[in-house]
Amino acid sequence: FPYTTLFRSVEILMDETILIGERFYLTGREDLTNKSRVELSALQPADSALPWFVMNHTPDDLDEPAKLGVDFHVSGHTHKGQMWPNEYITKKIFELDYGHRQKEQMHALVSSGFGFWGPPTRIGSQSELWVIDIQFSK
């Protein structure tokens, strides 16, 4: 089954920020390995009064988005280690390799996801797909 058919109406944000329904901004980041990746500061929304959500494949730096005013930052990439004992390595590499952390006003979430890198196996790491329900206060 071709995935392109399934996701035909899905817009992939690659170093882009868009306004959703005049209610919040959504930014999708290029992967950290892309040498032409745009700085997050260049993707900052014009209206700082609206919430700003950033999707970044790798949770490589949480300080910059917090300082720039990101409200919600979501990542994956780490696979929560994927196989024991790799979780100890990802905990050393990333400030947040799994779960939730608040930095200033920003809430950061890192999911273990459901894929893999390298060997097609996961041991001691729970696969997951999150549904995040956001409620805006008036």
Where are these regions (language model features)?
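Soluble catalytic domains of enzymes that build or remodel membrane lipids, polysaccharides, and related
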Residues: T4-K138
